[in-house]
Amino acid sequence: VMNARNSLIVAGLAVSEAAFTMVSPQVVCERKVADGQAVKAGTPLLVISGPTQAILTAERVALNFIQRLSGVATLTGRYVETVLGTGAKILDTRKTTPGLRRLEKYAVTCGGGTNHRIGLYDMVLIKDNHLAALAGEKPNPIAAAVQRARAKYPALKVEVEADTLDQARQAAEAGADYVLLDNMKPEQLREAVQLIAG
């Protein structure tokens, strides 16, 4: 029996089961909970039966998946709970563990979060290095970058990374679909959100 050691939000049951059944199709896993479910310490997650050697061979890999993905889901759930009632959404990052992107992004959704981008192909993200290349453009580099992105990729959403309140304002005025507020203190974040919301 695989039990939760702490209170957590479950994620990764299917991939954990796959670790067992890839070692031996004779291993049978019975789910006792569902991904996305909040459980208390001691709650049974999976009941595993089959050849002992196969179970012990796959056990560590299966546990690693459950631990990692449930950790992501649980932390996401805490953030989601913190912003409950504010209208804010918790979005994940594209900066994931190599080879685990889809699984970690799935775990974010188990915790109540929203996937931001899967890769570089599904949204235009205008960052500081792009803006530096457009220094001197009129009316400002952000407006120029948003305009160029919309012309070249009309079907994609455009996001602008803003390090300052002025950049956040310019991004909103330029019609960016999203403004990513980077490295701002909580009081700056509040002001930027009010500024962007109009």
Protein language model features and the residues they cover:
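Acidic/glycine-rich phosphate/pyrophosphate-binding loops and surrounding catalytic core
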Residues: V1-E159, D163-A174, Y178, R190-L195
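Short secondary-structure boundary segments
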Residues: N183
